[in-house]
Amino acid sequence: NCGKTYHALECLKQAEKGIYLGPLRLLALEVYEKMSELLPCSMVTGEESIVQPESRVISATVEMLDTSQEYDIAVIDEAQMIEDPERGHSWTRAILGIRADEIHICMSEDAIPVITHLISLCHDTYRIERYHRKTELVCEEEPFSFPEDVRHGDALIVFTKKAVLDIAGRLEREGMSVSVIYGSLPPQIRRRQVHLFTEKETGVIVSTDAIGMGLNLPVRRIVFMQTDKFDGKETRPLKPAEVKQIAGRAGRYGLYDRGYVTACSPDGLDFIREQIGTANTELTKVTLGFPHILLDMDEPMNTILQIWKSVQPEPPFEKIDITSILCMRRHIMSKKKLMDLKINTFCSVC
């Protein structure tokens, strides 16, 4: 709701050949639909591809970047994801590898030091433009009572598919019209759910934290039904940056003068209020993915993995954790006795 991505996309519209790279299929779809109103645009994600003849702009998820292509203008969105242990390497690859005359990198304030460090490593010049929220964000005084306090324009936030479906089911049994968003929702259904809420055919949306990644939805109030999330390793309290990212979706500029945020208990509301008032901790890590050049080596997998293990990058770089790949490899080897299995074959099996 501060307009940084909006301004970057306005510049992208001027490109003869441009690309938008975002974190979500839904976000790629949103940009594709907006761009398509004005100019030929294609969309590429891991799940679907819409190719328009003579398209000037591609809207894609960040993993789909083809670094062999050249662009006039590129937009890399939500670059604070560069520290993410699972997907961050895709932002590292995009920032270091994209071939564009002009690059707009949209991020939260806490990511500026590591991103500008990467730019400096490339000996490129940069300019920092800061944007501020255009609508006031108000933390409510009283905790939210479910389902009595549900109102039109609410977004109820949980962190698992099961919780999304449970809460949506309860609301529907109360006679409310509900949209849902979660990561594994098929693209066509996900698109339909967003459309229903955007067009106010449903009054409430129940979502995981995917809603925080820049989706431009007519949300009046964010309700944190939970304040803990499982991050792949442990269940932990939400970080200040995560709370602010999600809460920031409330009060869409142009529809509301204010956005509201609340939680389901006095302790939860105090926690959300505290996190919103806490400064984000600066990012200190840049995630490195498994290099494609190693995949092209005509060597046994053991040799290639040993090469990767021996690489010790200097800060702020950190290698992606390939523990799960190694565990899978050991399992395959114990079953198949394929000690000389090539890495490309192994990746195909995976």
Task: Give the role of each language-model region.
Residues 26-71:
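Inter-Walker segment of RecA-like/P-loop motor cores
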